[in-house]
Design a protein with these regions (language model features):
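Conserved segment of winged-helix/HTH DNA-binding domains
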Residues: 3, 69-90
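Alpha-helical residues within the helix-turn-helix
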Residues: 35, 46, 52-53
């Protein structure tokens, strides 16, 4: 039940939905995502953190940069279904 709550919270914000849609095109640096949406870095950091905690995005660090992407094939089916649903609804 806790995972469901994290996912629904993550999907309850338009900016987080837009981030997921942007990541369909591939991995993006947090700075690229922030610039793309024109939000404050701290605001985007919070959105990305919520998406990460819900399992809707993966991240990797390269030096001082953090890159985000949609989860790979190892993601739980619930996560895959949520992302597929968003993609189809957009």
């Amino acid at each position: 039940m806790r995972n469901l709550m994290k996912i629904t919270k993550a999907l309850s914000d338009e900016n987080r939905i837009r981030v997921l849609l942007a990541l369909r095109g591939g991995e993006l640096c947090a700075c690229q995502i922030t610039e793309l949406f024109g939000l404050a870095a701290s605001t985007m950091s919070k959105h990305l953190s919520i998406l990460y905690q819900a399992g809707l995005v993966d991240s990797r660090k390269d030096g001082r940069w953090i890159y985000f992407r949609l989860p790979d094939g190892k993601a739980p089916s619930t996560i895959k279904k949520a992302i597929d649903w968003i993609s189809k609804a957009a």
